[in-house]
């Protein structure tokens, strides 16, 4: 099947040439090249690089997933792994998996840092810190679940739930650290899935009236659910028969939204709440790292491009400017003048106070730069909680060619191959069938005839 015609090539070429010409004709491009600095001299440092991987299989009644996080660097390799199953009709299953994978990476970054010695030590993470803070993996579903739980069990019990779970997390981290110190790996790093039943029995089963017999009515502020001011949600319409549109809009304006929640809704909200708290806790612990750096390979920011009024991503802009004015793709870096400040609205006030390191970072901001480690290579985004001029020499000590060797090793070492995932899944399915043949109804694979 032919996918590319001569006409398509001409059209694509014209689009890209027009963009390139817009950059070359812009009179402000010299301001950018004047900000492009040579790389500083490397400084000897100890370091760990962390990366994660996931494999997800959607079966007939279940989503089964495998997670892995690996730290490679100045000490022995450290690994966290996790296998779990969730309902396939769980509306945010993909986001839950991603959030738990990032939780593993953050946890491992924090614990690996504690094993490094010396003043000049750092942690390298793959991806961006701004992405984790500005748009968390399950946002806004996680925020909605938090507010549902808070309204359902009351502010006092919700506060007790948070404090109890955070105390469990502190104990859990000590346990994981002991296992890593002894064995270098651990296969039960996610706490939420092990305690959600116990906390449900304590805070919901014995306290929420009518929980066991049917749906529970709960009033929640409209803003907490993320509804637009003049929109009537379907669930509100369904629970408000006999009321006029004007009456419903008035109730919404007064922030009196009534929802009827079933047992599954409540359980999912609790699970989402605990997962999100565990995720935020992992970020908060990682932010204790003095020299923390994130390296992003793929990103689409337009911070510089907007200053020139051109519609291309910053990496393409930098490449075009450097090649036009210097004549080759010179190594170096460009630091963004102002730190990126995550918006506080991303986090409810009642939650942010529990995570002081996140709160401080929101006030302080995240330092950002574009870096090319070697002439002719690609440009990466560097984000750090530390000044760029301070963190860059530490990570340059571990440069190999156009990239950072520890991150490269972590990426290749953590990757879950298709073959490995299939063999592991088949072993799990066989174990389930041996335990009870009826369990096979949950693990049938609809695409198997196509493979």
UniProtKB/Swiss-Prot annotation:
Keywords recorded for this protein, A-Z: DNA damage, DNA repair, DNA-binding, Endonuclease, Exonuclease, Hydrolase, Manganese, Metal-binding, Nuclease
Superkingdom of the organism of origin: Archaea
InterPro entries: NurA-like, NurA_domain, NurA_nuclease
E.C. no: 3.1.-.-
Activity: how regulated: Exonuclease activity is stimulated in the presence of HerA.
UniProt-annotated binding residues for Mn(2+): 51, 126
Secretion signal span: none
GO BP, one annotated term: DNA repair
Function, as annotated: Involved in DNA double-strand break (DSB) repair. Probably acts with HerA to stimulate resection of the 5' strand and produce the long 3' single-strand that is required for RadA loading. Exhibits 5' endonuclease activity and both 5' and 3' exonuclease activities.
Family: Belongs to the NurA family.
Protein's recorded name: DNA double-strand break repair nuclease NurA
Organism, as annotated: Pyrococcus furiosus (strain ATCC 43587 / DSM 3638 / JCM 8422 / Vc1)
Source lineage: Archaea, Methanobacteriati, Methanobacteriota, Thermococci, Thermococcales
Gene: nurA
């Amino acid at each position: 099947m032919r996918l590319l015609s001569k006409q398509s090539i001409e059209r694509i070429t014209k689009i890209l040439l027009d963009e390139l010409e817009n950059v070359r004709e812009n009179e402000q491009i010299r301001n950018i090249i004047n900000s492009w600095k040579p790389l500083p001299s490397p400084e000897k440092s100890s370091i760990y690089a962390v990366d994660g991987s996931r494999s997800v299989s959607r079966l007939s009644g279940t989503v089964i997933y495998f997670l892995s996080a690996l730290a490679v660097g100045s000490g022995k390799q450290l690994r966290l792994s996790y296998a779990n199953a969730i309902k396939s009709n769980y509306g945010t299953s993909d986001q839950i998996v991603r959030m738990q994978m990032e939780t593993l990476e953050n946890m491992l970054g924090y614990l690996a840092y504690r094993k490094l010695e010396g003043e000049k030590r750092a942690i390298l993470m793959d991806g961006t810190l701004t992405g984790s803070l500005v748009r968390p993996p399950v946002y806004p579903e996680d925020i909605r679940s938090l507010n549902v739980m808070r309204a359902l069990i009351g502010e006092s019990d919700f506060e007790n739930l948070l404090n109890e779970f955070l105390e469990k997390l502190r104990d859990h981290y000590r346990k994981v650290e002991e296992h890593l110190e002894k064995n270098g790996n651990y296969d039960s790093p996610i706490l939420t899935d092990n305690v959600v039943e116990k906390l449900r029995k304590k805070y919901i089963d014995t306290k929420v009236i009518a929980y066991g017999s049917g749906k529970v009515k709960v009033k929640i502020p409209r803003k907490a659910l993320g509804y637009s001011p003049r929109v009537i949600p379907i669930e509100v319409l369904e629970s408000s028969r006999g009321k006029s549109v004007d009456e419903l809009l008035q109730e919404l304006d007064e922030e009196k939204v009534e929802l009827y929640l079933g047992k599954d809704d409540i359980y999912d909200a609790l699970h989402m709440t605990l997962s999100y708290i565990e995720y935020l806790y992992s970020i908060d612990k990682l932010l204790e790292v003095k020299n923390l750096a994130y390296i992003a390979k793929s990103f689409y920011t337009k911070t510089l491009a907007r200053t020139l009024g051109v519609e291309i991503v910053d990496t393409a802009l930098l490449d075009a400017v450097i090649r036009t004015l210097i004549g080759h793709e010179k190594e170096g870096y460009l630091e963004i003048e102002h730190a990126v400040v995550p918006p506080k609205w991303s986090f409810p006030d009642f939650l942010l106070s529990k995570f002081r390191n996140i709160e401080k970072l929101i006030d302080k901001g995240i330092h950002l730069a574009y870096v090319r480690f070697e002439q002719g290579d690609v440009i990466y985004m560097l984000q750090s909680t530390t000044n760029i001029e301070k963190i860059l020499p530490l990570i340059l000590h571990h440069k190999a060619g156009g990239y950072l060797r520890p991150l490269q090793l972590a990426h290749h070492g953590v990757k879950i191959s298709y073959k490995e995932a299939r063999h592991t899944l088949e072993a799990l399915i066989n174990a389930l069938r041996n335990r009870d043949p009826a369990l096979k109804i949950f693990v049938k694979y609809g695409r198997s005839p196509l493979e």
